[in-house]
Design a protein with these regions (language model features):
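Glycine-rich phosphate-binding loops of nucleotide-dependent enzymes
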Residues: 1-247
Length: 247
């Protein structure tokens, strides 16, 4: 589904992403892990098109997207959530999701019209709210949601584009155990119908969710494989996981 060929990015003399080859297969939850500063978020930005690459190719569904704009990648079926929550904080949950649906469909939208006048737009927004466990929060202002609820809303914004591949950049960042549990369950539900490329530091979540894992260290992929193989890989343990996860 997604294939990266020798993808690279430099910032001055620093090589943030170094000739990365990566394949994400349709239907999988593919986790990308690595220490802080490994280049994970930069790599996600290159895939999403919010940052230009210096070298290499991005192939998605047999189309080359390397030099396309972010909106063209969204139209092709790529959606992204961010490491730092990115929502319309002054709008309600319903209006956030309706805006995302409208952006995808191109239908007209006005906050000054009654809800009933927008019909299907808000029906779909409510369905997405239910999908991300925010059905009872549709009237709440986004800024008043808990951190975990805001992250779930951001995932909902990504789902509103009807993606074929979702890029999730540390969706559990800053969450407590209960919020993390809910996010894991949400990603499990998403992964049943949408391919997911997941960047995450919570190793318990990664090993529960991922069908395959790639390890990025100093901008390079050092290993890719099933969770059991990654857990047992001596090079991975030395570089990232730690000997305590070897058992």
């Amino acid at each position: 589904m997604l294939s990266l060929k020798k993808l690279s990015k430099r910032f001055g003399g620093v090589v943030a992403v170094d000739k990365v080859d990566l394949d994400v297969t349709r239907g999988e939850v593919h986790a990308l892990i690595g220490p802080n500063g490994a280049g994970k978020t930069t790599l996600i930005s290159l895939i999403a098109g919010t940052m230009p690459s210096d070298q290499g190719e991005i192939l998605f569904l047999n189309d080359y997207l390397t030099h396309t704009k972010p909106h063209a990648r969204v139209a092709a079926g790529l959606a992204r959530s961010y490491q730092i929550t990115s929502i319309f904080r002054r709008f309600s949950v319903l209006d956030n999701l309706a805006l995302a649906v409208q952006a995808r469909s191109g239908s007209s939208f006005s906050f000054w019209k009654p809800v009933a006048a927008e019909g299907a737009l808000f029906d779909e927004a409510r369905a997405i709210a239910d999908e991300v466990d925010l059905a009872n929060k549709v009237s709440s202002i986004a800024a008043h949601l808990s951190h975990g609820e805001q992250r779930a809303l951001e995932v909902g914004l990504a789902l509103a584009t009807r993606p074929k591949l979702v890029l999730l950049d540390e969706p559990m960042a800053g969450m407590g155990p209960e919020e993390s549990r809910r996010m894991v369950e949400l990603i499990e539900r998403i992964g049943a119908s949408v391919t997911v490329l997941l960047v995450e530091h919570d190793m318990d979540a990664v090993f529960r969710l991922a069908s395959r894992i790639s390890v990025l260290v100093d901008g390079r992929i050092v290993a890719t494989g099933a969770p059991a193989a990654i857990r047992a890989d001596p090079a991975v343990r030395r570089a990232y996981l730690g000997e305590d996860l070897a058992a």
